[in-house]
């Protein structure tokens, strides 16, 4: 990551700030109502919706202008939370326990609870456990979220809430400002296949 220590200090402070906690609670209500939220992670800002709801996932694709064949990842609070919705190999489970939380997305076989809309109909899904206090607090409040950058597809990822595209901001019920993020998107790894799909943070 290229974020400074001061940036992280700001995020840590925001994690216990009363206003941020109130925003996190509002995010929980918004996600339960099928709406979108923007939240900071240790890499870039994420666009979140109920990852287990087809209609909510569709709203993410529409907002980003993203191809439906380009899958989204599943954001959760922990590896154990991921196991409730996936069937990873023992190797993949060990990999997740070694590297998560952190700026890595791990591709594993999904359970039926994960909708086709999230994965583009594929039988595998990327698992993301962010290493950021606000992101984890949001996930604790909401349950599994879409883990995708809060940008319009084809444009750069967003490192500050102020840099959000106006269309993304308008589509989001809650925008949680956690200061500047690290900047590089997560590395995407499929341990079972021995493949790195994207090199990132």
Language model features with spans:
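Active-site-adjacent structural elements in enzyme catalytic cores
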Residues: 1-201
């Amino acid at each position: 990551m290229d974020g400074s220590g001061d940036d992280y200090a700001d995020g840590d402070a925001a994690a216990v700030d009363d206003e941020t906690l109130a925003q996190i609670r509002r995010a929980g209500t918004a996600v339960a109502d099928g709406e979108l939220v923007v939240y900071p992670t240790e890499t870039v800002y994420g666009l979140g919706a109920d990852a287990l709801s087809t209609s909510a996932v569709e709203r993410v694709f529409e907002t980003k202008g993203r191809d439906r064949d380009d899958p989204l990842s599943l954001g959760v609070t922990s590896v154990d939370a991921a196991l409730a919705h996936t069937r990873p190999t023992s190797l993949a489970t060990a990999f997740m326990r070694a590297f998560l939380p952190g700026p890595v997305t791990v591709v594993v076989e999904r359970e039926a609870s994960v909708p086709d809309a999230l994965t583009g109909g594929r039988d595998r899904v990327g698992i993301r456990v962010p290493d950021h206090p606000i992101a984890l607090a949001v996930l604790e409040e909401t349950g599994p979220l879409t883990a995708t950058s809060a940008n319009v597809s084809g444009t750069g990822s967003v490192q500050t809430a102020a840099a959000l595209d106006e269309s993304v901001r308008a589509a989001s019920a809650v925008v949680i400002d956690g200061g500047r993020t690290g900047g590089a998107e997560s590395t995407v790894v499929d341990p079972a296949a021995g493949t790195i799909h994207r090199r990132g943070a």
